[in-house]
Structures are given as C-alpha cells and as structure tokens.
A protein has these predicted regions:
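Beta-propeller folds
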Residues: 1-257
C-alpha cells in the first residue's frame, strides 16, 4: 500500500497482525533521480514484482525507471496510445495493446515487437469487445484481454471479431451539442463476437491459436496459467449459461483437453 503523510511518501508492507510497517519503496528518495525526466514516483502505473523498477505513462509514451541502474528509459516514442501496459513477471518486458493489436517492448533495449497484425474497426487482439468487457471479463480490467505466462515467454490473449454484432447508437453528452457514436452491442438473441484464444510466443514472435469451433455459440474467457507455464487453462460457457467447462490448452500443440 502507499503511505503519504507530512514526512513519508512510500510503498509499504503492513503486517496485518501486528501493524508493523516495512518500507518497500521510498518515493522521497527516488524522486530526485526522476527530476530530469520530469517524472514523479508516486505517479507510477506499475511496479516490478521485486520492487526494483517503476513504469510510467507520460506524454503519451511509456517510461521505465530502474532503481539499481538509476536509469530512466523511454520505451515508446510515437503518437499512438499504449493501452493497459503490463510488466512481465521477470520485470524485463512490458506488454500492451496499441490500435487494438498486441505489442511487447523489451525494457533494456526499448525494442518494440508487434505480436499481432490484423486489427481493424471490428477485429481486436488483446483488447476486449464491448460486450465481453461489460458482461464477461469485467470492467475492472479496462478492456484488457491478455495475460502473461509466469515464465514471461508467452502471453495468452483473446481475439475478437465484432463483424457479426449489430451496431447500436449511443448518445454522448460531450461539448455543446453532444455527439452520436455507434457501438457493437448485441441485444438478447443477437450474434455475439467471434472469439479465439491465442498464445503469443515472445521469443519467436509466433501466435498459436487454440483449437476451438468458432461456429459454436459460446463464451470463451478467464484464462490462467499453470505455475510452470506448461499449460494454460481457460473456461468455456455455452450461450444458455448452463454448461461451464474448464479446458487445458498446450501452448506448443494448440490442443486442448
């Protein structure tokens, strides 16, 4: 948790039984090292698991501060927004979506790799369609539909094709006169988006698509990895929502059981 008072600005760990606090990151000590980059430690958007690095989003780009190296690295440098950046478990990479495609950037070299290439107005990779965000994955993920493997070598993600989903007009009360926008919004009985489960292999830049029948009307989501990253589990729920299956997918073979 973050603790801020008249003298302290830090990330602390609190013993629930005794109330004893242990400082994990002293933001007051870090901030002078961020002055040149015009960053503030308290405004980080993510922290590495070992508390040695901070990720920032500033000026429409990603920056990473390494505490051991006392170094700020600009990871991206373009006009496009990096959405839902997630640090890999080993703290060496950051994954995100950009223009509805999935990307990863190496923190040390700032080399960006595009993992998918077919995003469009109706196709999204690692970025949820509206109905999945609202009803399946949940709002708390902010449209994020990708998940790191524990070994940091793979990312499972969902690919959405909204082309069969009817559009629905939504009025936004912005500005003086407001505006009308159109959202792919399935009503009861309408077609849902076509969903595929993919696994992106970071080292080879290859995507493996898990075997599924795209013509079956079902919900595919909620993946989680085994601790050794050898299997990826996910759930499939039929449209009537009375038959839930938990499947195991094998990243190298595409097969599920």
């Amino acid at each position: 948790m973050q603790k801020r008072d008249a003298t302290t600005s830090a990330m602390v760990k609190v013993n629930a039984k005794t109330g004893e606090e242990t400082i994990l990151l002293d933001f007051n000590a870090i901030n002078p090292n961020l002055d040149e980059a015009e960053l503030t430690a308290e405004e980080n958007i993510a922290i590495t698991k070992d508390y040695t690095g901070l990720l920032f989003y500033d000026d429409n780009d990603l920056f990473f501060y390494s505490i051991p190296q006392n170094k700020v690295t600009r990871l991206t440098n373009d006009k496009d927004e990096e959405v839902n950046p997630m640090i890999s478990p080993d703290g060496k990479k950051v994954a995100y979506t950009k223009n509805k495609d999935l990307y990863v950037v190496d923190i040390e070299s700032a080399k960006e790799t595009r993992l998918t290439n077919d995003a469009s107005d109706v196709v999204y990779n690692g970025y949820a369609s509206w109905v999945y965000m609202e009803e399946i994955i949940g709002r708390s993920l902010n449209y994020r539909a990708f998940w790191w493997a524990p070994n940091s070598e793979m990312i499972s993600f969902l690919r959405f094709d909204d082309s069969p989903v009817p559009k629905f007009p939504l009025y936004k009360a912005d500005g003086v006169h407001g505006e009308l926008e159109w959202e792919h919004y399935p009503k009861p009985g309408d077609a849902n988006p076509i969903v595929k489960m993919g696994i992106a292999h970071i080292n080879t830049n290859k995507v493996v698509w898990i075997d599924e029948d795209e013509n079956v009307d079902q919900y595919t989501a909620w993946p989680f990895w085994s601790p050794d990253s050898k299997e990826m589990f996910y759930q499939v729920l039929n449209r009537d929502q009375n038959d839930l299956q938990i499947l195991s997918a094998h990243p190298a073979t595409r097969k599920n059981t």
